[in-house]
Design a protein with these regions (language model features):
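Intrinsically disordered, low-complexity basic tails and flexible linkers associated
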Residues: 1-157
Length: 157
């Protein structure tokens, strides 16, 4: 953990049990400050994809700590982007709250499905039933969904 990351964790009042978690050994890659839109975009690097609980805690504390200054965004960069089915599916509900994937039609259809993975490679399949408009969703929503997953640290997806 570098000093800047440590200072950020102090500012977020991150609990000791999280800070001592080996999965939470991070660094600040960069911070982009968008003055006009008042958004601070944090790029944080971790050894691997964070568990959903660690990610939610981090995102929440960033949002709260900077709420009087700006909105926050966080992109997780990982050294090891491997994942399993459980980790991938744990992040899926967050996807449906994010821009581009939060439309009622998309969430109503796809929130009932789960990803399957064959191995720890970059292969994940969303098994869906027979949908007449599947091509539309694949073209318009799946690339956005993939980008959101990449922002969570799923670099190999």
């Amino acid at each position: 953990m570098n000093d800047l990351f440590e200072k950020l964790m102090d500012q977020l009042d991150m609990p000791a049990e999280i800070r001592q978690n080996p999965a939470f050994r991070g660094n600040i890659d960069k911070v982009e400050v968008h003055a006009i839109s008042k958004v601070w975009h944090f790029y944080l690097k971790f050894p691997a994809i964070l568990s959903i609980d660690l990610y939610r805690e981090l995102a929440y504390r960033l949002e709260m700590a900077f709420s009087n200054i700006a909105k926050t965004q966080v992109t997780i960069l990982t050294e090891d982007g491997r994942f399993d089915e459980t980790l991938l599916n744990n992040y899926l509900p967050l996807i449906f709250d994010l821009p581009g994937c939060d439309t009622p039609s998309f969430t109503a259809i796809f929130k009932k499905y789960k990803f399957t993975t064959a191995d720890q490679a970059a292969t994940a399949k969303l098994l869906v039933g027979d949908l007449s408009n599947l091509e539309y969703f694949v073209k318009h929503y799946f690339p956005v969904m993939a980008k959101h997953y990449q922002d969570f640290g799923f670099t190999d997806l």
